[in-house]
Regions:
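Short amphipathic alpha-helical segments that mediate assembly, nucleic-acid/protein binding
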Residues: 7, 57-60, 124
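Immediate flanking context of iron-sulfur cluster ligation sites
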Residues: 64-79, 90-99
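Short flanking/linker segments adjacent to small metal-binding domains or redox-active Cys/His motifs
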Residues: 124, 128-136
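Iron-sulfur (Fe-S) cluster-binding segments and ferredoxin-like electron-carrier domains
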Residues: 85-120
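C-terminal segment of N-terminal export signals and the immediately downstream linker at the start
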Residues: 24-62
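N-terminal secretory signal peptides and thylakoid transit peptides that target proteins
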Residues: 1-21
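Mitochondrial intermembrane space
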Residues: 40, 45, 90-91, 135-136
């Protein structure tokens, strides 16, 4: 029996170490949870990016279309990636209006979760709690 690592074990150990140290999870970049905003009266999904603005990201079209259908829910959710920190950005809905959600996995993840839970009949408070548990 030898006391040294063969090449396969060495590369496996190196890969695991690099992954643990260098590849941070999305949650590592998420900011501490802030209070969720109150959905604005009369808010619509009219400003959510449409398929023509997502031509280079066709896999996101259905997500943006789904967000457009539930603006009163998504406008009541704080985005945990930090994009709603500038004063002109109010809620997770803002991320889908200004295009931040095109490239941000946290915005997309929160949006997908909100759409799924809303489809299951969950209330805004239940959706917020689930988002806080996963992303907060």
């Amino acid at each position: 029996m030898t006391d040294f690592l063969d090449r396969r074990r060495f590369l496996g150990a190196c890969s695991a170490t690099i992954a643990a140290l260098v590849v941070p999870s999305q949650r590592a970049f998420a900011l501490p949870a802030s209070p969720h905003p109150t959905p604005r009266p009369g808010i619509t999904g009219a400003k959510v990016l449409t398929a023509d603005k997502l031509a280079d990201r066709p896999r996101l079209v259905s997500l943006f279309d789904s967000i457009r259908k539930i603006p009163e829910v998504v406008d009541g959710i704080h985005c945990n990636c930090g994009c709603t920190n500038p004063p002109e950005l109010y809620s997770l809905l803002s991320c889908y209006e200004n295009g931040m959600a095109r490239d941000c996995a946290i915005c997309q993840g929160q949006g997908r979760l909100a759409v799924r839970l809303h489809g299951e009949g969950k209330t805004l408070d239940e959706i917020r709690a689930a988002i806080d548990a996963k992303f907060g």
